[in-house]
């Protein structure tokens, strides 16, 4: 039976735990560490997992160790648990869920030959609809990578990418839910401005985003094709699209994505 250690029981760590248990993993095979004793007890009571405060204890004989801590703590935690990982009877795989920390930095902080996987998650994994990209280190074999992918698939889709694409991936997936939340927020405000009750405007906007996303995913059609299907000549939708285009919506997204990628690259150099 696979044993999982989750170092850090924040939002991402809890989402992972929730997904694993929903996929019928035995909670007693999941160890979660927290700095806060209260938070640890909360997760234990909610999911029945093993709550620990010692990272090395959690990593002891764990098959996969997920690092769900802030980027600034990744190297510190790796240094803390590397001795334990060296003594495990089978090779453990370390999976970083933090932005900005390269595979090279992690491999240099651990013992030689440690299998390391770098993941860029996003927050929709909190509701089982995440998008996680995975990048394997030099010492990760095909079986280990497949195991990590299977575990991550419990909280959404998984895609393997090259590390050179991580900054672009951050802009397109890691941070993009926030862009869509902002667009939804603006659409709700527009509805209120038109006289709709806020609750009604929110329901309409959220349902429209959900439906549009499902159409793009399930029909296989290009977004431009689906948009054209809603845009009758000289109709209401065309009038709205014209205003958005003239307001520079495409350029705004280009610039936002570039700014995000640039910032990701900058953080990765620290």
Curated annotation (Swiss-Prot):
Q: Which family does it belong to?
A: Belongs to the pyrroline-5-carboxylate reductase family.
Task: List the Pfam families hit by this protein, alphabetically.
Answer: F420_oxidored, P5CR_dimer
Q: Provide this UniProt record's keywords sorted from A to Z.
A: Amino-acid biosynthesis, Cytoplasm, NADP, Oxidoreductase, Proline biosynthesis
MF annotations from Gene Ontology: pyrroline-5-carboxylate reductase activity
Catalytic activity line of the entry? L-proline + NADP(+) = (S)-1-pyrroline-5-carboxylate + NADPH + 2 H(+); L-proline + NAD(+) = (S)-1-pyrroline-5-carboxylate + NADH + 2 H(+)
Q: Where in the cell is it found?
A: Cytoplasm
Query: What is the predominant subcellular site recorded for this chain?
Result: cytoplasm
Q: What is the lineage of its organism?
A: Bacteria, Bacillati, Actinomycetota, Actinomycetes, Mycobacteriales
Supply the name of the protein.
Pyrroline-5-carboxylate reductase
């Amino acid at each position: 039976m696979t044993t999982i250690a989750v170092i850090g029981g924040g939002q991402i760590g809890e989402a992972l735990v929730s997904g694993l248990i929903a996929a019928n993993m035995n909670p007693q095979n999941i160890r979660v560490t927290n700095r806060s004793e209260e938070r640890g007890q909360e997760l234990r009571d909610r999911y029945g997992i093993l709550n620990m405060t010692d990272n090395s204890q959690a990593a002891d004989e764990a098959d996969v160790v997920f690092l769900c801590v802030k980027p600034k703590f990744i190297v510190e935690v790796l240094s803390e648990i590397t001795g334990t990982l060296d003594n495990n009877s089978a090779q453990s795989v370390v999976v970083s869920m933090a932005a900005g920390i390269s595979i090279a930095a992690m491999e240099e902080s651990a013992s030689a030959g440690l299998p390391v996987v770098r993941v860029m998650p996003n927050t929709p994994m909190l509701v089982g609809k995440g998008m996680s990209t995975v990048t394997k280190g030099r010492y990760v074999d095909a079986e280990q990578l497949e195991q990590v992918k299977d575990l991550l698939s419990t909280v959404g889709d998984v895609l393997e990418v090259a590390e050179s694409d991580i900054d672009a991936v951050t802009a397109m997936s890691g941070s993009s839910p926030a862009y869509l939340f902002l667009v939804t927020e603006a659409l709700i405000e527009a509805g209120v401005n038109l006289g709709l009750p806020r609750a009604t405007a929110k329901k309409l906007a959220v349902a429209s985003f959900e439906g549009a996303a499902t159409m793009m995913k399930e029909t296989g059609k290009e977004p431009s094709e689906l948009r054209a299907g809603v845009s009758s000549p000289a109709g209401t939708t065309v009038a709205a699209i014209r205003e958005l285009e003239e307001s520079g919506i495409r350029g705004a997204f280009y610039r936002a994505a570039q700014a995000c990628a640039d910032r990701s690259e900058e953080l990765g150099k620290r």
